[in-house]
């Protein structure tokens, strides 16, 4: 029968880390034990998993999923993340689609670069993936006197209860993946 190895597809020649094996095993276990996720998880797999340290000794697990399967993952995102967080107790789980950045074409080259492969587009898409149950309702970029930039991202206040405890994890993961500082806030709504 199948094993946990079928739940992770790495690039050729890349060894599986211990965390990759644990995540693949968790997906395999969920597919076999959880009836409501069984049919959806049957055809899904992951590319890799990375552990990110958050302040206060907490950790987050970033699971990279194939770009083609991102819509299928979005349908079951909330339930899947809840189950994975139970399996990896005390760690936040964040699902991100694997995307590639292509360098700008050389001068005189006829080849065009697709918009979704630019650095800006990939970083914005990663930001959307990181905060997924919530939606981004606004962004502000603040330039400090010393030249550093901080991006303020405003999240949908309706999802405050589901995502407020993960805001630190969102910032740490986005900083690790892109190198950019970001602060997440919920705008104040007038009643």
From Swiss-Prot:
GO terms for biological process: translation. InterPro entries: Ribosomal_eS7 (IPR000554), Ribosomal_eS7_CS (IPR047861). Residues 15-50 form a coiled coil. GO terms for cellular component: cytosolic ribosome; cytosolic small ribosomal subunit; nucleus; plant-type cell wall. Pfam families: Ribosomal_S7e. GO terms for molecular function: mRNA binding; structural constituent of ribosome. The modification N-acetylmethionine is found at residue 1. Keywords: Acetylation, Coiled coil, Ribonucleoprotein, Ribosomal protein. Belongs to the eukaryotic ribosomal protein eS7 family. This is Small ribosomal subunit protein eS7z. It comes from Arabidopsis thaliana (Mouse-ear cress). The gene is RPS7A.
